[in-house]
Amino acid sequence: MEEREESISFVDQRFLGSKPLDDTNVLEYFSGSPFYDKSCNNEILKMQTQFRGLDQKSKLFSMVGIFYEVESSNHEKTLFVIRKAYNHGDTAETLGMYYIIHGHVYAAPTNYSIYRCRMGDSMWQLNSFIDRMMEKRRFNPFSPPKGRRLAKSLEDSKDLDFMMEIFNDFKKEQAES
């Protein structure tokens, strides 16, 4: 089973020991990571221009296919954001984002993984609330129903108060932890 990009990281201590990362060599460093596609346009241009000294950046945006570019970096050169994109000719579609923090390369989470994580957290919270409510609730399916409507409406309001009390207790516990 292939490991998901979001769960792995990469660091090359040998590269970092030989020279510090900056805007000129960060893509070279990134090319050694498992996130880098060796068949991208950056590699093709590197082979074609390595002895000619041509500007790769201007050629890169005119080629159709996958390419990588440094999207941004901070002033201290400890954080770099790298964009993986597919150039269709007239437009470029972002395929992924990666970031390098102090030499460690990570894949940025996708919208899907963020939503999935948030939904999982929400479901866990809801399940915890229901479990807590069921611990405090005294329900007997075999008890006979109340005959009068007034008694029923009073019981419903007690149930609502009871549920609100449990919910507020649960919210307080979550805020404290």
Swiss-Prot record:
Assigned keywords, A-Z: Activator, Nucleus, Transcription, Transcription regulation
Gene3D superfamilies the record matches: Mediator complex, subunit Med6
A GO BP entry: regulation of transcription by RNA polymerase II
UniProt key word Transcription regulation: yes
Localization: Nucleus
GO molecular function, one term: transcription coregulator activity
InterPro entries named in the record: Mediator_Med6 (IPR007018), Mediator_Med6_sf (IPR038566)
Any single Gene Ontology cellular-component annotation: mediator complex
Protein function: Component of the Mediator complex, a coactivator involved in the regulated transcription of nearly all RNA polymerase II-dependent genes. Mediator functions as a bridge to convey information from gene-specific regulatory proteins to the basal RNA polymerase II transcription machinery. Mediator is recruited to promoters by direct interactions with regulatory proteins and serves as a scaffold for the assembly of a functional preinitiation complex with RNA polymerase II and the general transcription factors.
Family statement drawn from the similarity comment of this UniProt entry: Belongs to the Mediator complex subunit 6 family.
PANTHER family cross-referenced by the UniProt entry: MED-6-RELATED
Complexes and interactors: Component of the Mediator complex.
Protein name: Mediator of RNA polymerase II transcription subunit 6
Organism in which the protein naturally occurs: Encephalitozoon cuniculi (strain GB-M1) (Microsporidian parasite)
GN (gene name): MED6
